[in-house]
Amino acid sequence: MKFEDKLKARSREDVWNEYCGFLDLSMDEFVQIQNRLMEEQIALWSRSPLGKKILKGSTPKNIKEFRGLVPLTSYDDYASDLLQKKSELLPDEPVLWIQTTWEGGKHPIKVAPYTESMLDTFKRNVCACLLLGTSTKRGDFKARSTDTILYGLAPLPYATGLLPLAFEEEIGIEFLPPVKDAVKMSFSTRNKVGFKLGLSKGIDYFFGLGSVTYYVSLSLGKMSSGGGGAISLLKKSPLRFAKIVLAKCKCIKEGRELKPKDIFKLKGFMVAGTDNACYKDDLEELWGIRPMEIFAGTEPTCIDTETWSRNGLYFFPDACFYEFIPSDEMEKNLADSSYQPRTVLINEVEEGMSYELVISVLKGGAFMRYRVGDMYQCIDLKNKDENIKLPRFKYLDRVPNVIDIGGFTRITENSIDQVVKLSGLKITNYIAKKEFNHNNRPYLHLYVEMDPHAQITQAISIEILREQLSIYFKYVDQDYQDLKKILGIDPLKITIIKAGTFAYYEKNHSHKIKKINPPTLEINELLTIQDQDYRVEMGGRLYE
């Protein structure tokens, strides 16, 4: 029976329990589900050519043996098979392949296979998100098959394109604009058409990357303030036209700009991706409803969601088997790639600790003990206020050696090296840090040291450096280009470091400063060195 039919035929309590009942599980019950599904997955995966290749002849009999035999994996371990879409090597037949960016400057894309069972689980869990997204308390929801949703997503083959597919098969929610039309439109056109349709039909849901929904929300406010389409709207929906007129009058009286909440009353608002914490307060102010955060990705599918209180994430028990690398273990591994970090299970996490997530995709998935590249913090082990007995998590960011801005970029040391090389600029050293401005918006801060000869012979200003490096970031990383095209921002800030500063730092310390996201304390120390009198030898010459 489809989700839509269940909403009509069953009691609200039955529907809630079927989709959101995982929130009533005890920790032991959650672990039992995890273990049962993982044992099934191990048996399936171990028999596949892909599994045999990674296991190297070993045959694990249980989860403990599996964790001891199978090393932590990355996409490099699967690339040769998955990029060629060799279905015959997989644990189960994929019915769909999802695509995303791998690493700018080195690998263009990575793909992930989805089995029918994985898609069934995905559909069930996004329906749970739909119920939770409209809820204000346990068991309460407002989802209807006649609802509308503003289309703010990337289409297939990207992971967000699965949402319209899932809803199409489960519930007749109307996308604005319709998916078949939206996929052919530019981002700007899609916003304008969706907004015009929303004015006449109303908007019940909004879902997208936090950064994108913020940009779209600002655009809606500006479009609402304009007069375009007023006559058409008056003919189609006189009541909605009157509501807009009254809203504009109210805003003029209060001396403020028109906001989406003045026109629309959302039932549910969901955001995904990174940096959502930077936008949620502003989005709540714009729409009058706090966004509910979920986490979904190309490899892991939809794995966790907030609840009616919008104050922490809970993992679904049936999407992946979860392991967690403690942050100190992760740091040891980043410093020494030969070091094998230990993992803990979900019933072993500690309150207040931060972890790198490791997943094994259930239901015939390809990825096992896979490092997704995302960081979580355990807020608490149980939520007494909501009577939830499961660990509650906060999404932090990507792992420290990757800089993600607004859910778009995957900037690494390799991609920056490529940019520097292609630019031809005489940059001898750099560090890159994800920082936040006074509005809590993320940006990429590059601290660069120029060749002293170049500084003498070339009139290189910070602005010229920024412009040239931006050009090559857009060339190396398509997602970086989308930041400008979709969000209208160029997140690059440049600080020029005096020649010899890095060498002086290394001379007086037992280590080199990390190139990607070094500690703020070390950056401040580097900047302090510039104000000191020092001499350092570079290329056989002394500089001071």
Role assignments for model-derived ranges:
Residues 36-98, 106-120, 127-144, 158-162:
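Active-site diphosphate/adenylate-binding microenvironment
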Residues 132-173, 181-183:
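Conserved AMP-binding loop of ANL adenylate-forming enzymes
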Residues 121-128, 215, 415:
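Short amphipathic alpha-helical face segments that pack within enzyme cores
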Residues 87-90, 151, 208, 271:
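Redox-cofactor binding/interface segments in oxidoreductases and associated redox assembly factors
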Residues 104-107, 374:
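Active-site-proximal glycine-rich helix-loop-beta segment
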Residues 101:
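Function-critical acidic carboxylates
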